[in-house]
C-alpha cells in the first residue's frame, strides 16, 4: 500500500458499528496525534503472507477509534494515513485463530506532516491535476479543438483520463528516460512519452487532436509541479457514512501489465456470482486474463480465449519504450 498501483483490485463494504463488534480475528484501538484523537484517518493492515498481497483499510471515528474486521490469519504491517499527516511507522501485528468476539487492541500514533508539500503527497490525484492550465474559452477554436468543452472532453472522459489517473505521482512527473538527464525539455519529453507503451497509437492520436497547445499544457503542468507548485485546495477527511467503509485490496496480475477494467457480476442482477471470482481486462498489455479469488485471497490467470487461433495479438504491435 505504499503506492496506488494498477495491479490491484479493491472491494468496499459497510462495516458494523464499533459498539456492536462480533467479529473474529480483528484489530481495534485508537489513533492519536500530538493534539489528541485523530478523526477520519485511515488505518491500514497489510500482509504478504497470503497467496497474494492483501490489505484491509478502515476509517477512525470522532474519537479516533477504529476496527479492522475479519482478518485472515497472517502477520500484518499496520499504520496510519490521513490528510494532514505523513504515514506513521509500521507496527507488526499477528492475527491467529481465536474465539469469536476476540481480537487484538493496538493503539497507533499519527504523524503530522512537517510541511504543506509533504502533506500534499497524499492528496487525491485530481487535486494535482487541477493545477493544469486550461485554455480560456476566448482562445478557441484552438488547433483542431473547436471549443473549451471539446478540449476538456478530450483530456478527460474522451481521451487521457479515461485510462490514466492524471495527477498521480507517476503522471505529474516526467520519468528521466524521457528527459534523458535533462537534455530534453518537457515539451519534447511529453511528445515522446505519449508514444510509449502498448497504447502508443491511441495516446498519440488523442494528443494530436490537442496539438501543440495540448503538449504545452502538459509540459507547463509538470514544470510547475517540479518547481514546487502545490494544490490550491485541501481535501477534507472522510465524514459521516464514508467512515463506515471497509476497503479490501488485493494485488493481481503483474506490475508490467495494466488493468483497464474488471467484472464480478451482472449489473442487471448483482446477486450473480456472489463471493465468486473476479475477472480482469488487461486490454492491450497482455493476452492473460487475471483472476482473483477473494475468498481464498489468491490469484491466477488464463490465456484469453479466441475463436480463431490465428487471431493476432496486440503484443506483436509496435511497442514504445516505457
Identify the residue ranges that each predicted region occupies:
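Extracellular beta-sheet/turn segments enriched in Thr/Pro/Gly and aliphatic residues
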Residues: 24, 96-121
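Short, ordered, surface-exposed loop/turn motifs in non-cytosolic proteins
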Residues: 33-49, 73, 126-140
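Short Pro-Gly-centered beta-turn/loop motif in secreted/extracellular proteins
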Residues: 38, 67-75, 83
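A short, solvent-exposed loop/turn motif at the edges and junctions
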Residues: 47-53, 75, 79-96
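Short, acidic Ser/Thr/Gly-rich low-complexity loop/linker segments typical of extracellular
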Residues: 48-67
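The canonical Cys-X-X-Cys-His
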Residues: 157-168, 218
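Structural signature of eukaryotic scaffold interfaces centered on beta-propeller domains
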Residues: 255-274, 316-322
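Beta-propeller domains
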Residues: 273-275, 279-321
Amino acid at each position: 500500500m505504499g503506492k496506488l498501483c494498477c495491479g490491484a483490485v479493491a472491494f468496499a463494504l459497510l462495516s458494523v458499528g464499533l459498539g456492536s463488534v462480533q467479529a473474529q480475528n480483528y484489530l481495534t484501538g485508537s489513533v492519536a496525534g500530538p493534539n489528541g484523537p485523530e478523526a477520519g484517518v485511515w488505518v491500514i493492515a497489510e500482509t504478504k503472507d497470503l497467496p497474494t498481497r492483501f490489505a484491509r483499510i478502515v476509517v477512525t471515528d470522532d474519537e479516533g477509534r477504529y476496527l479492522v474486521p475479519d482478518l485472515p490469519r497472517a502477520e500484518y504491517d499496520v499504520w496510519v494515513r490521513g490528510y494532514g499527516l505523513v504515514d506513521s511507522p509500521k507496527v507488526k501485528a499477528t492475527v491467529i485463530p481465536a474465539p469469536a468476539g476476540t481480537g487484538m487492541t493496538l493503539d497507533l500514533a499519527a504523524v503530522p506532516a512537517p510541511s504543506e508539500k509533504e502533506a500534499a503527497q497524499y492528496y487525491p490525484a485530481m487535486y494535482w491535476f487541477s493545477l493544469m492550465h486550461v485554455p480560456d474559452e476566448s482562445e478557441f477554436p484552438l488547433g483542431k479543438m473547436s471549443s473549451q468543452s471539446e478540449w476538456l472532453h478530450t483530456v478527460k472522459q474522451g481521451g487521457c483520463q479515461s485510462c490514466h489517473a492524471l495527477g498521480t505521482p507517476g503522471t505529474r512527473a516526467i520519468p528521466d528516460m524521457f528527459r534523458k538527464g535533462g537534455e530534453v525539455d518537457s515539451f519534447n519529453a511529453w511528445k515522446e512519452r505519449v508514444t510509449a507503451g502498448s497504447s502508443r497509437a491511441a495516446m498519440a492520436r488523442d494528443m494530436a487532436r490537442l496539438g501543440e497547445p495540448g503538449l504545452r499544457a502538459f509540459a507547463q503542468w509538470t514544470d510547475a509541479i517540479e518547481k514546487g507548485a502545490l494544490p490550491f485546495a485541501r481535501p477534507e477527511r472522510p465524514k459521516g457514512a464514508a467512515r463506515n467503509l471497509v476497503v479490501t485490496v488485493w494485488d493481481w496480475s503483474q506490475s508490467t501489465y495494466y488493468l483497464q477494467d474488471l467484472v464480478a457480476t451482472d449489473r442487471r442482477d448483482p446477486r450473480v456470482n456472489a463471493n465468486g471470482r473476479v475477472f480482469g481486462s488487461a486490454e492491450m498489455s497482455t493476452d492473460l486474463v487475471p483472476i482473483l479469488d477473494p475468498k481464498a485471497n489468491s490469484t491466477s490467470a488464463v490465456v484469453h480465449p479466441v475463436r480463431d487461433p490465428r487471431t493476432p495479438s496486440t503484443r506483436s504491435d509496435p511497442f514504445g519504450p516505457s
